[in-house]
Amino acid sequence: ALHGTQITPEDWALFYRCYAQTYAEHGNPPYLNRDFFARMAKDMGEHWVLIRAERSGRPIACSLLAVQGWGGSDAVAYGRYWGSLEHHDSLHFETCYYQPIEWCLQHGVQRFEGGAQGEHKMSRALLPVGTASAHWIAHPAFAQAIGDFLQRERQGMAQYVEELQERTPLRRND
């Protein structure tokens, strides 16, 4: 794992190649461009951790974590982006979950967020939690419609998270 200034321009280029390749394989252009990552490296470089996977000495996959509160007791690592040049069983989980969790343990980061979506993460003991986001919608009627929907969705999502929590693979002491 590389952190902050340890991540070279060549590493960023490799990451973007992996990231773009993964989107291309799903028939989509990447939603973030190379310039976005170049700016993040320049302006917020200390907040990133790059995990590389290699096969026979060649890099084949990368994941990129965002770290908030670095060095503090409330630091959080967020699994954010990933990509691969080759396909191997469990490569995604190794690169995006197992290695980042190991990095967190080694660096005293108490919390790892594996990213939004994906009930498949539960089998890896990444349990669902609510997340928040902020958006500004310029059109008043559209903003109201979205607000109404989100209010209804909130109840359904809370119930769904509760149902998923009941199926945790972790042992409970209650």
Please annotate each region the language model reported.
Residues A1, R111, A116-D174:
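Terminal substrate-recognition subdomain of acyl/acetyltransferases
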Residues F15, Y23, F36-F37, F93, ...:
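Phenylalanine-focused residue identity feature
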Residues Y19-P30, V67, C104, G108, ...:
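A generic secondary-structure signal for well-formed alpha-helical elements
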Residues E10, E25, E46, E54, ...:
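Glutamate identity and glutamate-enriched acidic tracts
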